[in-house]
Amino acid sequence: MSESLVIRQLGLQPYERVSFAMHRFTDARSTASADEIWLVQHPQVFTQGQAGKAEHLLQPGAIPVVQSDRGGQVTFHGPGQQVMYVLLDLRRRRLGVRSLVTLLEQTIVATLACFSISAHARTDAPGVYIGADKICSLGLRIRKGCSFHGLALNVAMDLSPFLRINPCGYAGLRMTQVSDLAPGTGIDDVAPVLLAECLRLMKASAGEIQGWDPAYYGT
């Protein structure tokens, strides 16, 4: 089993605050820094990835649009969506970018299987799908051999804002969520399973779940 990860449960936090913290953490870390996983939800926000095109923002309305340096196109975050950010030293864990993407996709597939939901990844588009419908989006950034950003799993949320964009740059892509397929399932049910499956696939362990670290996130 590889070295232990720090797990942080951040609750509901503005996207820009957490993005700032990820950058600050990654810029400050050394080869001795522990890897971290952050579990968080965001207030409603559209985020444009590095490859994002304005044409895929159809009618954002009053929902803010934030530029992100993660990979990919536009997506939507909102309460009831479990976001998991993975801040990993890829060299130390002997992971390539493709293998990390595969690990995250496998994490979602295994998590959903625990709720009797059959899901799959696609070779032509990152993420996890139920049939033709997308349930989880992925977007990563690598800096100094370390990853940040991560995945967003739709659990029990308002999906209607996805109709205001071409999700991940695909016109007409339908989104689905865990609670539509396993009624009554919420974030509190999914989050511990998601974390456990990720740690299992990484062959990693974790200590007690922590909250904000003011050194990186502010108070």
UniProtKB/Swiss-Prot annotation:
Which residues are the active-site ones?
C168
Q: Which residues bind substrate?
A: R70, G71, G72, Q73, V74, T75, F76, H77, S137, L138, G139, G150, L151, A152
A single GO CC term for this protein reads:
cytoplasm
Keyword Transferase belongs to the record: yes
Where does this protein reside within or beyond the cell? Cytoplasm
Q: Show where the BPL/LPL catalytic domain sits.
A: 31-206
**Enzyme class, UniProt record, top EC level:** transferase
InterPro entries in UniProt: aa-tRNA-synth_II/BPL/LPL, BPL_LPL_catalytic, Octanoyltransferase, Octanoyltransferase_CS
Q: In which pathway does it act?
A: Protein modification; protein lipoylation via endogenous pathway; protein N(6)-(lipoyl)lysine from octanoyl-[acyl-carrier-protein]: step 1/2
Gene Ontology annotations of biological process type: protein modification process
Entry GO MF terms:
lipoyl(octanoyl) transferase activity
Under Enzyme Commission nomenclature, its number is: 2.3.1.181
Q: Which UniProt keywords apply?
A: Acyltransferase, Cytoplasm, Transferase
Catalyses:
octanoyl-[ACP] + L-lysyl-[protein] = N(6)-octanoyl-L-lysyl-[protein] + holo-[ACP] + H(+)
| Protein family according to the UniProt entry | Belongs to the LipB family.
Q: In UniProt terms, what function does this protein have?
A: Catalyzes the transfer of endogenously produced octanoic acid from octanoyl-acyl-carrier-protein onto the lipoyl domains of lipoate-dependent enzymes. Lipoyl-ACP can also act as a substrate although octanoyl-ACP is likely to be the physiological substrate.
What protein does this entry describe?
A: Octanoyltransferase
> Organism, per UniProt?
Sodalis glossinidius (strain morsitans)
Organism taxonomic ancestry:
Bacteria, Pseudomonadati, Pseudomonadota, Gammaproteobacteria, Enterobacterales
